[in-house]
Amino acid sequence: MREKIDVHAASPGAEASRTLRIDLHVHTLASDGVSDVEAILEAAVKAGLDAIAITDHERIDAALAARAIAEGRGSPLEVIVGEEITTRGGHLVGLFLRRRIRPWHSLRSSVARIHEQGGLAIIAHPLVPYPLCASARTIRRLMDEPDPVFHPDGLEGFNPTTARMRWSRRAPAFAEEVGIAAVAGSDAHAAHHVGRAVTTFRGEAVAGLRGAIARRDTGWEGEPYTWREQVRMFGHQQRKNAAAIRDEVGGKVRRDGTGRDLGYPGGRARPARFDRTAAGLGEGERA
């Protein structure tokens, strides 16, 4: 039986018109997801979300494509360009990015790089004793830095992948202790998981997310993934990886050198590029 968690936080005097729901952690075929951008966008609309953040590992090209497609269609869904960055201190989600953040730098410098381009830095699935998860000690050390450029803006108080682990249950209280916002995202790797966990806040538009995080005025809704769902997803990812290897080996013959399809317009190339024409955009239109 699924355990649904619904936590809303709002300042008593907040003037706002409605509760907005945003999934801040979504992967596509461009990294280790198994669904293409079109399927992700469709699922987000069906889930009634106001926005999603595409946060592929170490890349933002599919996120740029998703945003351009949504805007080009006049969709009410907003797409936040993000990235899940592998740092030496654990995974870090960057939101509202303009440029890719390179992996394997320190967590401290990666947070600063996100802030330098006007983005938000969110610690992904914290506290779990695993190399890809930031420890409490590491996060406290960042928050003790005298320069706020090194301070993360928030951490995942709920991630359905790790929510059943006892360490993750401490995350909301830990966020309160160190003085940063607790948010949530589905960490979806397939379209049908989009919206499984969302960040909520009171506001009039998605642009208000920045202020809500700064005020620590966010809540979340979510359901943990079952172990069966996680095992099934691992199997899907392994089959995808096997197919990708076949495409890499056979791509020159089948596609005249274009390589594997990364699941968005213009994605059939390495290194990946965003093809404006394939997305239905002219040269003068913004991506």
Describe the function of each predicted region.
Residues 77, 81-86, 127:
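Short glycine-enriched loops at secondary-structure junctions
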Residues 57, 126, 160:
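Flexible loop residues that form catalytic
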Residues 102-105, 115, 119:
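Core dinuclear metal-dependent hydrolase active-site scaffold
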